[in-house]
Amino acid sequence: MAGPTIHRDMEKSSGYCEAPENLGLSFSIEAILKKPTERRSLPRPQSICKEDSRQTTIPGSKLERPPQDQPQEEKKNKRRVRTTFTTEQLQELEKLFHFTHYPDIHVRSQLASRINLPEARVQIWFQNQRAKWRKQEKSGNLSAPQQPGEAGLALPSNMDVSGPVLTPTAMTTLVPPTECCLLSQTQLPSSWFPTQIPLVPWHPWDLQPLPGPLTQHPCVPTFMFPPLHPKWGSICATST
């Protein structure tokens, strides 16, 4: 009995222990080679699976979110703020757009400083206005642009004009035709001419508004008049 106890004490002190036989474990080479399927079918502990899954993920790396999973705050920040223009600003912008559709950087900067707007906003307004103008031009709803000269010559609606306004066609009727032949005083007796002849101004803008309608008499050439008899002059002189 002393022999086995001494042997066990020596095994405990050396740290070497035999495998217990009741567990059914055998560490021989034959047993290991004969049972490969049994080793594969053994369930792995859950702790090992968790460690393997942790090792596959790189520490410190974050997966990128798809665009649809982005927060709403980021989408709101990306939206552009719409600019509200005042009436004076729109008038200045439309006036320059009527003059040119493609202003350069210097003109845009001057206009932006005058109407208190950023130059980028002015550029965006011109881009949108050009697109709107092209769309209206294609649809056929675009009205003919007014020339700057016509805008300056147009009379205001509240202007009080005394007398009839002479149109260009009416002005041409006042100017005597150049092909008319003037009757000289030597061809007619002196009694046919009054003492004072009112002079008609030659400039249309010097004419005063006439009370009645304008009538144009045809000019009769001098060769259509028959020669005057000497007695006719004496008759006209006695009648006057």
From Swiss-Prot:
| BP GO terms, sorted | negative regulation of intestinal absorption; regulation of transcription by RNA polymerase II; regulation of vitamin A metabolic process
In terms of Pfam families, this protein maps to: Homeodomain (PF00046)
UniProt keywords (A-Z) are:
Activator, DNA-binding, Homeobox, Nucleus, Transcription, Transcription regulation
Please provide, in alphabetical order, the Gene Ontology terms of the cellular component aspect for this entry. nucleus
Q: Where in the cell is it found?
A: Nucleus
Q: Which InterPro entries match?
A: HD, Homeobox_CS, Homeodomain-like_sf, Paired_Homeobox_TFs
Residues in a coiled coil are: none
Write out the transmembrane intervals: none
Region entry Disordered, spans: 36-82
Residues within the DNA-binding region(s): 78-137
Q: Which domain of life is it from?
A: Eukaryota
Which tissues does the record link to its expression?
Expressed in intestinal epithelial cells from the duodenum to the proximal colon.
Gene disruption phenotype: Mice appear healthy for at least 1 year and display normal histological features in the gut. They however show defects in intestinal gene expression with a dysregulation of the scavenger receptor Scarb1.
Instruction: State its role.
Output: Transcription factor that regulates gene expression in intestine. May participate in vitamin A metabolism most likely by regulating BCO1 expression in the intestine.
What protein is this chain from? Intestine-specific homeobox
The root-end lineage is: Eukaryota, Metazoa, Chordata, Craniata, Vertebrata
Designated gene of the protein: Isx
